[in-house]
Amino acid sequence: MYTLDDIKKEDPEIASAITDEFERQNSHIELIASENWVSPAVMSAMGSILTNKYAEGYPGRRYYGGCECVDEVEELARERAKELFGAEYVNVQPHSGAQANMAVQFAILKPGDTIMGMNLDHGGHLTHGSPVNFSGSYFHVVPYGVNDEGFIDYDKVEEIALECKPKMIIAGASAYARTIDFKRFREIADKVDAVLMVDMAHIAGLVAAGLHPSPIPYAHVTTTTTHKTLRGPRGGMILCSQEMQDKYNFNKAIFPGIQGGPLMHVIAAKAVCFKEALQPEFKEYQKQIVKNAQALCKGLQSRGIKIVSDGTDNHLMLVDLTPFGLTGKSIEKLLDAAHITANKNTIPNDPQKPFVTSGIRLGTPAATSRGLKEDDFDKVAEAIAMIIKEGESAVEPAKAIIKTLTDKYPLAF
């Protein structure tokens, strides 16, 4: 296996950037909800010689010779994913969650078909119908959102569906802190003869551990990323019944539809990730993610910080900065100076532009992987609240709090 020393010999500039990034991650508390730390085994699989192998097609039906070993890798990944989520069909080749979503939409829909997805400003995702994304360009999009309390209004979703008669309803989000009722979504979809697609990218780890209701029994087709709460490599996946695969041929939609050769080193890392997620320790890790999110949320609220929907059921939360007249952009910068990594994020009915925003999104998966517990997250909440309330003058005191945590939980790599 190659090491950083090998990179230093060939490319000292890249080696320096990698070293700097390690130091940044080690000295910061990562609260970006979509980030996590993979295991050494997952990382080793991604850096393996499998990156050398081209393998267009699927196991047993490749367009290249010498694929018997990578066939075994892909079969292991598929079978483990089936066991993990209880799905009949799995495709592990999507390079990303966005490409998994694209493949599903292109397999089922025609240009101009009507789809419903959560408004990006209310917590949805670009690929759920945003006008700046392919999904908003190829299809007629009718968005739904959250009510004044920050919850999905399922009666309103049904009302919109009955009016616009969509071909597809997309459930799932990138910034929604509450449990999603997939059963209710399926009932709505059935009333208008729509396909229900669920994007569980953010909550896949919680679903695998049984801490969030699974979409698999209700969705016609489910997509996900393999990183985030699942703690695997960056990549995507499609899951559904064999009947849905037979009807829409998602295999063909991925290859040759929107991709060429699969990334076999990443698929190997996915297989390792799925095996890790099948272990009892993974469920305990997911439980700690939720406990930590609730501790962070309560810690912020007890210090006068407003949380959208007044709480969280999963791994993330949205902080509403409007009571302080602040922007997500400014607070993200101050938090970074205090060695807290978070991202600015729109809140429902946000008056600010998407690159400015009135909120920040916080998540606990990465810091939980690092080892932080509830008491530690209360200290993180203290540091964040100081920054929001006191501004630049609080950067150094907040940074000192964070240093006690990063010293206590150094990165293992």
UniProtKB/Swiss-Prot annotation:
EC number assigned by the record: 2.1.2.1
Entry keyword Signal: no
Cofactor section: pyridoxal 5'-phosphate
Pathway(s) annotated for this protein in UniProt: One-carbon metabolism; tetrahydrofolate interconversion; Amino-acid biosynthesis; glycine biosynthesis; glycine from L-serine: step 1/1
Positions of post-translational N6-(pyridoxal phosphate)lysine modification: K228
Main location: cytoplasm
Xref: InterPro entries: PyrdxlP-dep_Trfase, PyrdxlP-dep_Trfase_major, PyrdxlP-dep_Trfase_small, Ser_HO-MeTrfase, Ser_HO-MeTrfase-like, Ser_HO-MeTrfase_PLP_BS, SHMT-like_dom
GO biological process: glycine biosynthetic process from serine; tetrahydrofolate interconversion
An MF annotation (GO) of this entry: glycine hydroxymethyltransferase activity
Site features described as Plays an important role in substrate specificity, chain residue numbers: H227
Pfam families reported for this sequence: SHMT
Localization (cell): Cytoplasm
Binding site for (6S)-5,6,7,8-tetrahydrofolate: L120, G124, H125, L126
Source organism, top-level taxon: Bacteria
GO cellular component assignments: cytosol
Family annotation (Gene3D superfamilies): Aspartate Aminotransferase, domain 1, Type I PLP-dependent aspartate aminotransferase-like (Major domain)
Function: Catalyzes the reversible interconversion of serine and glycine with tetrahydrofolate (THF) serving as the one-carbon carrier. This reaction serves as the major source of one-carbon groups required for the biosynthesis of purines, thymidylate, methionine, and other important biomolecules. Also exhibits THF-independent aldolase activity toward beta-hydroxyamino acids, producing glycine and aldehydes, via a retro-aldol mechanism.
Subunit structure of this chain's protein: Homodimer.
Family statement drawn from the similarity comment of this UniProt entry: Belongs to the SHMT family.
Record-linked PANTHER family: SERINE HYDROXYMETHYLTRANSFERASE, SERINE HYDROXYMETHYLTRANSFERASE 1
Protein name: Serine hydroxymethyltransferase
Source organism (scientific name): Agathobacter rectalis (strain ATCC 33656 / DSM 3377 / JCM 17463 / KCTC 5835 / VPI 0990)
